[in-house]
């Protein structure tokens, strides 16, 4: 994947302002609420019975932060995203059997959350760079499935 200097700048400038704990929790909660079938991968998380329960669930918050923290590894390693996610791809494929489509859904949700959080700063050019990034990350995570 080739990243232009502008794309890299747009991604890193937004990433530098992201509250990983808040945005991560919000992204995972939104995934579980908007796409309820994804909840089956989180049966050990306790109460996921309603949007309020999901949003307030400490396990959802903790895992959301973990997910977005690892997303930060992609931002730091834009030129080696495949390598960066090789082990996570293996874990999600071989052990957890996560549907790779879920990675794409979560990426799209992350873009929505960034747009909501950053408003006018999240320009169409910025969105394009982030959309490319979440696609590349989703593809890297799904790599073990191919």
UniProtKB/Swiss-Prot annotation:
Heme b binds at residues 63, 92. This is Hemoglobin subunit beta. Involved in oxygen transport from the lung to the various peripheral tissues. It holds the Pfam family Globin. Residues 2-146 form the Globin domain. Gene3D superfamilies: Globins. GO terms for biological process: hydrogen peroxide catabolic process. Keywords: Heme, Iron, Metal-binding, Oxygen transport, Transport. The gene is HBB. GO terms for cellular component: blood microparticle; haptoglobin-hemoglobin complex; hemoglobin complex. GO terms for molecular function: haptoglobin binding; heme binding; metal ion binding; organic acid binding; oxygen binding; oxygen carrier activity; peroxidase activity. SUPFAM superfamilies: Globin-like (SSF46458). Red blood cells.
């Amino acid at each position: 994947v080739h990243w232009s200097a502008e794309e890299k700048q747009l991604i890193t400038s937004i990433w530098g302002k992201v509250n990983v704990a808040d945005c991560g929790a919000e992204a995972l909660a939104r995934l579980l609420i908007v796409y309820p079938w994804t909840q089956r991968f989180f049966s050990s998380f306790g109460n996921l019975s309603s949007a309020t329960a999901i949003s307030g669930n400490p396990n959802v918050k903790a895992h959301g932060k973990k997910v977005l923290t690892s997303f930060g590894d992609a931002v730091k390693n834009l030129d080696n995203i495949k390598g960066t996610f090789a082990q996570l791809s293996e874990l999600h494929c071989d052990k957890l059997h996560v549907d790779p489509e879920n990675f794409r859904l979560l990426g799209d949700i992350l873009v929505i959350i960034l747009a909501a959080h950053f408003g006018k700063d999240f320009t169409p050019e910025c969105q394009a760079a982030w959309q490319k990034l979440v696609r590349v990350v989703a593809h890297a995570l799904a790599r073990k499935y191919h």
